Amino acid sequence: MQMKATILIVLVALFMIQQSEAGWLRKAAKSVGKFYYKHKYYIKAAWKIGRHALGDMTDEEFQDFMKEVEQAREEELQSRQ
């Protein structure tokens, strides 16, 4: 049932892209597609590494990881100012 709903959503989205007069959505999708095609091996490798690294974490380890990510983001923002 979920697969049918996903397929329906994709088909509606494709129809909306086709009917878009401005074509900006089609251009954006094409740009994302080109980026993915060009870097798909790196994207897939990063996805596998991320799933492997995060998949073995307990909830506490994941919370600590997210705190470290947030802290690194804040430090990056402060260094830009």
From Swiss-Prot:
Modified sites of kind 5-hydroxylysine: K40, K44
Positions of post-translational 4,5-dihydroxylysine modification: K27, K30, K34, K38
InterPro entries from the UniProt entry: Styelin
Leucine amide sites (modified residues): L54
Propeptide regions on this chain: 56-81
GO terms classed as biological process: defense response to bacterium
Compartments reported by the entry: Secreted
Superkingdom of the source species: Eukaryota
Signal peptide positions on this chain: 1-22
Tissues in which the protein is found: Hemocytes and pharyngeal tissues.
3',4'-dihydroxyphenylalanine sites (modified residues): Y36, Y37, Y41, Y42
Record-given protein name: Styelin-E
Organism: Styela clava (Sea squirt)
